[in-house]
UniProtKB/Swiss-Prot annotation:
GO MF entry, a single one: haptoglobin binding
Organism of derivation: Pagothenia borchgrevinki
Domain Globin as annotated: residue spans: 2-146
Domain of life: Eukaryota
PROSITE patterns assigned to the protein according to its UniProt record, in alphabetical order: GLOBIN
Positions with a binding annotation for heme b: H63, H92
Protein name, UniProt field: Hemoglobin subunit beta-0
């Protein structure tokens, strides 16, 4: 993947401004509410029966934060995201048996949460850079499935 200077700067800027303890939980909670079939991967998290229960679930919050910290690795290794996520791809495919389509759903939820946080600063150009980055992440996480 070729990154422009604008794309690199935009991705680094977005992640430097994200409040991981807010955005991570909000993203995973949104995914679990909007796409309830994704809850099957989180059965050990306990009560996921309502949007309120999901939003207040400490394990959802913790894992949402973990996901964002995982994205830090991609931000720091934009030229080699596929290899950066090789082990994570194996984990999700072979051990956790996560449907790779769910990575795209989570990426879409993150885009919505980030757009809401950034407001008018999340211009079309910024969104294009962010979605390109997330598409590479999603592809890399799904790599083991192919």
């Amino acid at each position: 993947v070729e990154w422009t200077d604008f794309e690199r700067a935009t991705i680094k800027d977005i992640f430097s401004k994200l409040e991981y303890d807010v955005v991570g939980p909000a993203t995973l909670a949104r995914c679990l509410v909007v796409y309830p079939w994704t809850q099957r991967y989180f059965a050990k998290f306990g009560n996921l029966y309502t949007a309120t229960a999901i939003a207040e679930n400490a394990m959802v919050s913790k894992h949402g934060i973990t996901i964002l910290h995982g994205l830090d690795r991609a931000v720091k290794n934009m030229d080699d995201i596929k290899n950066t996520y090789a082990e994570l791809s194996v984990l999700h495919s072979e051990k956790l048996h996560v449907d790779p389509d769910n990575f795209k759903l989570l990426a879409d939820c993150l885009t919505i949460v980030v757009a809401a946080r950034f407001g008018s600063a999340f211009t079309g150009e910024v969104q294009a850079a962010f979605e390109k980055f997330m598409a590479v992440v999603v592809s890399s996480l799904g790599r083991q499935y192919h």
